[in-house]
Curated annotation (Swiss-Prot):
Phosphoserine, modified sites: S172
Cofactor(s) demanded: Zn(2+)
Enzyme Commission code: 3.4.24.15
Catalysed reaction equations from the record: Preferential cleavage of bonds with hydrophobic residues at P1, P2 and P3' and a small residue at P1' in substrates of 5 to 15 residues
Main location as per UniProt: cytoplasm
Name this polypeptide is given: Thimet oligopeptidase
Tissue: Ubiquitous.
Cofactor note: Binds 1 zinc ion per subunit.
Subunit structure: Monomer.
Biological role stated in the UniProt entry: Involved in the metabolism of neuropeptides under 20 amino acid residues long. Involved in cytoplasmic peptide degradation. Able to degrade the amyloid-beta precursor protein and generate amyloidogenic fragments. Also acts as a regulator of cannabinoid signaling pathway by mediating degradation of hemopressin, an antagonist peptide of the cannabinoid receptor CNR1.
Keyword annotations of the record: Acetylation, Cytoplasm, Hydrolase, Metal-binding, Metalloprotease, Phosphoprotein, Protease, Zinc
Active site: E474
Gene Ontology CC terms: mitochondrial intermembrane space
Amino acid sequence: MKPPAACAGDALDVAAPCSAVNYLRWDLSAQQIGELTTELIEQTKRVYDRVGTQELQDVSYENTLKALADVEVSYTVQRNILDFPQHVSPCKDIRTASTEADKKLSEFDVEMSMRQDVYQRIVWLQEKVQKDSLRPEAARYLERLIKLGRRNGLHLPKETQEKIKSIKKKLSLLCIDFNKNLNEDTTFLPVTREELGGLPEDFLNSLEKTEDEKLKVTLKYPHYFPLLKKCHVPETRRKVEEAFNCRCKEENCAILRELVRLRAQKSSLLGFSTHADYVLEMNMAKTSQVVATFLDELAQKLKPLGEQERAVILELKKAECTKRGLDFDGRINAWDMRYYMNQVEETRYRVDQNLLKEYFPMQVVTRGLLGIYQELLGLTFHLEEGAAVWHEDVMLYSVRDAASGKVIGKFYLDLYPREGKYGHAACFGLQPGCLRQDGSRQIAIAAMVANFTKPTPDAPSLLQHDEVETYFHEFGHVMHQLCSQAEFAMFSGTHVERDFVEAPSQMLENWVWEAEPLLRMSQHYRTGSAIPQELLEKLIKSRQANTGLFNLRQIVLAKVDQALHTQTAADPAEEYARLCQEILGVPATPGTNMPATFGHLAGGYDAQYYGYLWSEVYSADMFHTRFKQEGILSGKVGMDYRSCILRPGGSEDASVMLKLFLGRDPKQDAFLLSKGLQVEGCEPPAS
């Protein structure tokens, strides 16, 4: 295929001098967090007051648009210093103070977003200024501020604005509480070794004990997933799956109902028929009808595959019940899913996950992963010894552009679970890469937070292959944060359309299914030997295992999210149970309330969970069209990717970036093939 046109800004060097300063600090006491929050609010409000009280004839680019952009840079950094510790600090007092700071700052954000005086001056500036006198990104920034003003109802009567402001404040506090409840959940189940039959010794040895010598199984990922995959005692799996999907059931169920009600009310005041339509206006999909069609069509295509996979699982379950002398109930329960999906991998594809993880010690995976990213994107990483961090497990790396030697950013790695810590894997942007007030470029800083299995005195941290995939995915977000070269904080890093934001990192997951990269990030933790060729081939083939059921479950979650945000009366638990039965063919466990544990619903993905599947269309297309054709470790394609897809941040529309990188408009073919589906006139991708 002919390589696409050169990408905008191929020269990755930027004219602006770079300020390689880390403005972040992690040594604040709970009291200081409270004091600095008040100070930050006062400082920032002064800038908005200045802009909002100017005479209209005095409004200019410098004293209005630039003033707002400059304060956004300093405010974003200071805000992250104050509100990020709620997710990672080992000290409960600091986490609590940080959560309180987040609540105050979120209320303040609402106040500032509803400043009609500021909005009027921005509108006035747009009418007054010659559009071609602004740099393209500045013009986009101006247009975006006006669009956001209208989306906050600043063109509506004052009374309506007050209602919207009140709803927005309530929403932000409810979202913080919803996720805080999940993070702070310390539920555990005391179990005996016998009840954990099937789990490996290293897992059992890593568990804390209760006073009566039982083992403590928490509901955090490093306990929950291995147990559901490997424990051959159905009753233990049932108890743990039920407890997991009953976390924070009472409090979060009430919060979720209120979130859904308030979102619908706000969207209606703004003239939208549903909250989903309000949210989607800013995305690639544009309307809830487009999303519904996408999910329905994909579900129809995947259902036959799901049926075949369920039949295989029932066969396996019947054989297992006979072997272990258990009653066979003739159905698949929610607590059976992961166990038998794992058995499919082990029996049909002969992939022994316990053996495999011995080849993925954390240090080797990290070294290989960092090496691949450096080579692919033309970067060099350097570990900063003795850096100031929030916990002794955390590492800080600086990142340079390999060609120019310039520092472009830094990233923190915080990879192991702790009590009170954020419970999933995520990338947090902490310092936006953008221009500062004096015109110099501020480097981007991000943190990757995860919950991989901790090392023990007998063994290093050993990663399951799906954890290696998660590591690659989240680190892809880190690279998006660091490689973007936007001028404005609003467009820095991953500030792209929400149904595109996952595509760059999803694309990079492909590397953990290819032989060459896999060999570079693995070796046996005791012998140092490489993964045997046969095991490697089986692993790569197993990518197609359970693809129907896995993706149908993603559709269930996306449809629950859409249902809650298009039909206000929908009951979350009932809707989830109905869709599980209808689409997945596996009932939800009675009495559970999965949506009350679904952090995405309160974490900025409201009406947007479909984006994971939607953006896979683009990630599959990018990988198969460029990397698979021209070389998966090709530095040339890697640099095209860095300059076309990562470099702009959100300063261009995703559709424009994709067309530049692909040399054409995106297509669904590679996505459908990757799901094990037939596409007319296309060969399945070589595995």
